[in-house]
């Protein structure tokens, strides 16, 4: 792996190595950093793909988001993010919705996320409902926040 491209002074190889750390926060940080490097970190795509099987939901979400920015669009990231919309932890569901929205309407396979995001309108956690509504607004090309959020700003 290339030592020339770095994020915060750490090489792609070292960030990819963090994906194997015993500490889930380090694994999440490795995924985040590789995502920040973006397409220049394509050599870490297989490491990120392996991290999609991580036992910790938030690590899978960050790995999927990073893979979407590092590798050519394949739909694999969308599949993982959609699966995480059903995680038992509200912050993982919210984070997955956030990332789905930011992939944008042109991302390959994103149309599969519309129905699951709509189903989150009834989620018991308000942060999940808000992120799902924002993601839908971004993916459906409306630009403005959806009407469901109006009550939160008044």
What is the predicted role of each segment?
Residues 6-18, 39-53, 72-86, 107-121, ...:
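Amphipathic alpha-helical scaffolding segments comprising HEAT/armadillo-like alpha-solenoid repeats
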Residues 1-8, 25-40, 50, 58-73, ...:
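Structural detector for internal amphipathic alpha-helices that build alpha-solenoid repeat scaffolds
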């Amino acid at each position: 792996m290339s030592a020339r491209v770095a994020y915060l002074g750490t090489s792609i190889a070292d960030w990819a190595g963090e994906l194997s750390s015993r500490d889930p926060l380090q694994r999440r940080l490795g995924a985040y950093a590789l995502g920040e490097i973006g397409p220049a970190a394509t050599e870490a795509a297989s490491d990120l793909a392996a991290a999609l099987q991580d036992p910790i939901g938030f690590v899978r979400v960050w790995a999927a988001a990073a893979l979407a920015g590092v590798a050519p669009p394949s739909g694999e990231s969308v599949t993982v993010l959609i699966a995480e919309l059903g995680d038992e932890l509200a912050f993982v569901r919210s984070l997955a919705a956030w990332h789905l929205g930011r992939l944008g309407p042109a991302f390959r396979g994103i149309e599969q996320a519309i129905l699951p995001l709509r189903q989150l309108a009834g989620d018991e956690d308000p942060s999940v409902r808000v992120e799902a509504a924002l993601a839908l607004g971004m993916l459906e090309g409306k630009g403005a926040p959806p009407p469901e959020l109006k009550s939160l700003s008044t």
